[in-house]
Amino acid sequence: MQHVAEVVVCNPRKNALLKAGNKSDQIDARKLAELLRADLLSPVYHGENSTRILKELVRSYSTLTEDTTRIMGRLKALYRSHAISCAGKKPYGKRHRQEWLQQVQQPGLASRAQRLYDQLDAVQTLRRAAKREMLAESHKYSVYRLLCSIPYLGPVRTSILIARVQVPNRFRTKRQFWAYCGLALETRNSAEYRFVKGQLQRSKKPVFIRGLNLNHNHDLKNVFKGAATAASIHDGPLRQFYDRRLAKGIKPELARVTLARKIAAMALILWKKGESFDPQYLMSQAA
């Protein structure tokens, strides 16, 4: 590393040249050198170790949350497979657990359901412990209180946001941040120009929007879309922003995406400026 002028960490998905032709260490090095010379490599951010502890704690909490969801799904699938109605959250609670187990007639099936309940209790205990540890670590960051001031972002979502973004200055604009969070639009267009009476004119054909970008950080997308969903059903300045979009004729699902983009943009701006949330941001900044 003493003789290296610059270290570039690049996205291997975009190095299509490496897939063509023969492959060896020498050939790959030559192709990478050609891509670097032509400025065709796509650099990605390789963060520092300052948030390493929080990142691991967030990953632990997220994994345990996913495990909890899976166990709950298996438990309800067991009841549904025997035509037992199990809507809502009652099948998971300890108060009526014996009543649910008594509805299962087969001894082997009842034993399986009991094992799932034991597994659910154990994972929920671990998840609560992981959550406490994650929140305790996130409180050490000065930006934590600033981001928590944004309505419906909350302690857990703020912890995930800090761990995944690390530093806000890696995103020069909010549109770059939207793309990283899976909130950017993917468009397709062709035949943009045509000849009319010998003159080249731009076609009036509208740009085809395919939807939100697929290559993104899924945790951050869940953070902002979850906050937008909560804000759209509770009173507050964000709900007013959402209602104004509905009044303009925008569909509810598109209005929620717009609200998620707004929350993401505010989080990035407040993080960079070191300021707390002010409802005036909803009026001064364009969505």
Model-derived features: where do they sit?
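Generic structural signal for well-ordered, non-transmembrane alpha-helical segments
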Residues: 62, 69, 121-128, 261
